[in-house]
UniProtKB/Swiss-Prot annotation:
The modification Phosphoserine is found at S148. Changing S162A: No effect on phosphorylation. Involved in cell division. Involved in mitosis. Regulates dynamics of microtubules (MTs) during mitosis. Required for cytokinesis. Binds polymerized MTs in vitro. Is able to rescue a mitotic division defect, the proper positioning of the nucleus, of the S.cerevisiae BIM1 knockout mutant in a complementation assay. May play a role in spindle positioning and MT distribution. May be involved in MT nucleation for the formation of median bodies and in the biogenesis of flagella. Changing S140A: No effect on phosphorylation. It comes from Giardia intestinalis (strain ATCC 50803 / WB clone C6) (Giardia lamblia). Disruption phenotype: Knockdown of expression by morpholino has serious defect in mitosis of the trophozoites. Knockdown barely localizes to the nuclear membranes and localizes to the median bodies at a lower level than in wild-type cells. Knockdown has increased number of cells with four nuclei. Knockdown results in reduced formation and volume of the median bodies. Knockdown has increased number of posterolateral and ventral axonemes without central pair of flagellar microtubules (MTs) and slightly reduced length of the caudal flagella. This is End-binding protein 1. Residues 15-117 form the Calponin-homology (CH) domain. Residues 124-169 are annotated as: Disordered.
């Protein structure tokens, strides 16, 4: 089996939004996940990975809702081991993910969703067992759905021809708009990522160099860095 390559930064997987990802993982695992930072625990990925490769994840070793970085590291090492054994070419920067920073975890979250969709062969509408972890379910409401299904089976032509038609020109225009939006989204994502890298470099530099500006000054370099970090890592509120 040839290795499954991780997509580059221009891949469509990096255009999936935070809200969609959190909704997906919450429904998949039947466990509410409210923040991207919660994924730093690693146990969510272990549970989902055990659906892709049933029985290959030793769920007895997984530390659920891990808080300490060393516990989280153990979970991500389990994930890395399973991926490597299945010839998946994806390096995991464990040291970054376990700190719980939004940008690092969001990027890995996007990749994992892409990977799951590419490799999961089970039913996404029924209950699925996840090793020794909790049962992972994704249910749909009965009633109206079954009724509409029965109606479509009785009258297949009606279901196949219903809805407005879109000509090729309109479809092409929509594709161009989507492509433009994706490029703009990636552009701003890259900017944020560069700022995060710069902040890490500045924090490291400030531990080695004495700053002459008084600490109570709004232009004090540590104050500037702290303010930018506050903006970068502020939680989203609907």
């Amino acid at each position: 089996m040839p290795p499954v390559k991780a997509p580059g930064n221009v891949s469509d997987c990096y255009f999936v939004g935070r809200v969609s990802l959190l909704k997906w993982i919450s429904e998949l695992l039947n466990e509410p996940v409210k923040k991207v930072e919660d994924l730093a625990s690693g146990h969510h990925y272990c549970m989902a990975l055990n659906l892709v490769y049933p029985g290959q994840v030793n769920m007895h070793r997984v530390r659920m809702n891990a808080i300490n970085e060393w516990e989280r590291s153990e979970n991500f090492k389990i994930i890395q081991d399973v991926l490597s054994r299945n010839n998946i070419d994806k390096g995991i920067d464990v040291n970054k993910l376990v700190t719980g920073k939004y940008m690092d975890n969001f990027e890995f979250f996007q990749w994992f969703k892409w990977f799951f969709d590419q490799n999961y062969k089970g039913s996404k509408s029924g209950a699925t067992e996840s090793g020794s972890a909790n049962a992972v379910t994704k249910t749909s409401k009965p009633g109206n759905r079954s009724g509409s299904t029965a109606a479509s089976m009785q009258n297949p032509k009606a279901s196949s021809t219903s809805g407005p038609s879109i000509d090729s020109k309109e479809l092409e225009d929509l594709r161009r708009q989507i492509a433009k939006g994706q490029l703009e989204s990636q552009f701003y994502f890259d900017k944020l990522h560069e700022i995060e890298i710069y902040m890490d470099q500045m924090n490291e530099l400030m531990t080695q160099v004495e700053i002459a500006e008084p600490e109570d000054s709004p232009f004090y370099i540590k104050s500037v860095v702290k303010k930018i970090e506050d903006i970068l890592y502020a939680e989203y509120h609907q």
